[in-house]
Curated annotation (Swiss-Prot):
Residues 43-59 have a biased composition (Acidic residues). This is Ral guanine nucleotide dissociation stimulator-like 2. Interacts with SAMD9. SUPFAM superfamilies: Ras GEF (SSF48366), Ubiquitin-like (SSF54236). InterPro entries: RA_dom (IPR000159), Ras-like_GEF (IPR008937), Ras-like_Gua-exchang_fac_N (IPR000651), Ras_G-nucl-exch_fac_CS (IPR019804), Ras_GEF_dom_sf (IPR023578), RASGEF_cat_dom (IPR001895), RASGEF_cat_dom_sf (IPR036964), Ubiquitin-like_domsf (IPR029071).
Amino acid sequence: MLPRPLRLLLDTTPPGGVVLSSFRSRDPEEGGDPGGRAVGGGQEEEDEEEEEASVSVWDEEEDGATFTVTSRQYRPLDPLAPLPPPRSSRRLRAGTLEALVRHLLDARTAGADMMFTPALLATHRAFTSTPALFGLVADRLEALESHPPGELERTTGVAISVLSTWLASHPEDFGSEVKGQLDRLESFLLRTGYAAREGVVGGSADLIRNLRARVDPRAPDLPKPLALPGDSPADPTDVLVFLADHLAEQLTLLDAELFLNLIPSQCLGGLWGHRDRPGHSHLCPSVRATVTQFNKVAGAVVSSVLGATSIGEGPREVTVRPLRPPQRARLLEKWIRVAEECRLLRNFSSVYAVVSALQSSPIHRLRAAWGETTRDSLRVFSSLCQIFSEEDNYSQSRELLMQEVKPQPPVEPHSKKAPRSGFRGGGVVPYLGTFLKDLVMLDAASKDELENGYINFDKRRKEFAILSELLRLQKECRGYDLRPNSDIQQWLQGLQPLTEAQSHRVSCEVEPPGTSDSPAARTPRPTLVITQWTEVLGSVGGPTPLVSWDRPSVGGDEVPGTPAPLLTRLAQHMKWPSVSSLDSALESSPSLHSPADPGHLSPPASSPRPSRGHRRSASCGSPLSGNTGEGTSRSAGCGGGVSGPGSSDCRIIRVQMELGEDGSVYKSILVTSQDKAPSVISRVLKKNNRDSAVASEFELVQLLPGDRELTIPHSANVFYAMDGASHDFLLRQRRRPSAATPGSHSGPSASGTPPSEGGGGSFPRIKATGRKIARALF
């Protein structure tokens, strides 16, 4: 770095700019502003010629207060220059309430301890009341009436400045309870003549006028509740009617209004942590309103997924709408999409409300519904859960709050790139629970008073640092520009959330504990495309018309009872629409079923809904008979037919497994032309929660009409070895070698009895029968 005289001679600074020659970060508590700039005209120039040598810290006791003194000894860069005197600064660490007020009204505090005044005004309710603090200020001024005029004028000027700052930053502190203290202050100003004086105390008249406007018996304006009395309960499943981004914007609008009305000082751990104590129900109304909104959003998620509406406080005072797993999966996907849109809007309060509701026990245990949810939705849900992970003290959510929103470039009103539905600029709504937890933990970890009875003001400084972050976020929250939507807000107002007991009972009715928690229910089932199960096709193509999920029904063109809609969906590999396609359909088609119509949620109950888990394609292309009446009258036990060229290479079989005293359980298994008996046996064992390693100890037996059995050889291909007359099988322990049981078959060569006329045989037996016929004819 060039010496200062040489820098002054060589003026190389370009016009309108400044050359940075050196810098040193400063403590904002030690005479500098928060940006690190020193207070004082020539302080920077003096610092350029010095470098810090040593720092000493010690405590001092003075008039009921403990100060932390920091002394910095600087050494000049010029070794021949004399050593300058050390620079000292004092911070109040602890003291009595009277000592805090004296330090507050000390004219030197503004420059030496900048953060003391805002920290005291923001946190004083944790250890005293506003009337008590205001009264001590009036006492201090009255005690100085006999002092020299200069000291009285300086102290009065500081008091007017402090009270003006107090009124501007915390107007909620001034209510009817401080009327007596205000009268004392006004009397003091009139008595001493400062009320009409200009200059340092010239703002006293305006201060008294503004304080009088605030000090009245009127109650503060609280946020309006969301639920209006007399409204009819809304159907929670109507969430499917609204677009996800529109619903997210309305939630953000409500959350932003509540967050802007939040009083940060009411979040203090000494206040919020004691809210449940007797006589404290009136504390922290702005925080309670925010928490109520959070719980209402979470309750809306639980109610809609369960399809239940509360009509009372009792566990059974609930109206439940019957929903099947595919329908609940659509609701899960919808709320995941809403949470993602809230994340894009930086509304972390509603994001966590939706995520916590989906993670709650009544919803998380619905494994059948989660199994029907698309992988994309599950991936988005996992990323949202990661945002609020407790790892590293919610580090990821804190980092997202710290990120600044890049200003959007101006766009034309009719441009295709214009922001959607009123979102302009960038705001933020934090999840308040993170800050409440920090403040409660800080309150529990630090003592309110030291051993000598002094107020621990270092604790209040740490609390004020957290409150300052809330104040910063409130300023950023004003960046929203959203418009209310009456339909969505009316629906939100009409929701009646379930109690914890009600939601648990409804969830257990939807999926009893034995089914949802079993290992079999936790195993994802593959998606199957069925073309040879005539019973299912007949039931789908029966008298109930099929409702397409891909687009609204236009009615009239499709004849009820035909399987054509199902074939169309099978050709599309059963791709159910995501939430985005649902939104577009709802927006574009006025012919969509109304929310009260259960048909708009899913296919009819007779249609088998494949799992949304792991999709698996199967080459099943055999044509179906156009005679639907024949298809509906057939049973699964007599369908099928002989495999051959042009027919399907996969079948659905029903396997019964003997479980001893527990009875029998049937499982449906997809058998392809490549499956051997051991692989089929292993899959059946896995589906019945048995060890597949013992597959060699079991045998697969086909149950034929007339109480006959066909034992599938262990090395045979099940698809070709089975009799086409039946799809029913039995899995049992392998029997020891013994005489064949009359009426049973152990394979093609075990019996000379030909297959029954009504059903087809296996391919080797068909060839043997053909040879016999040829020999008889020729």
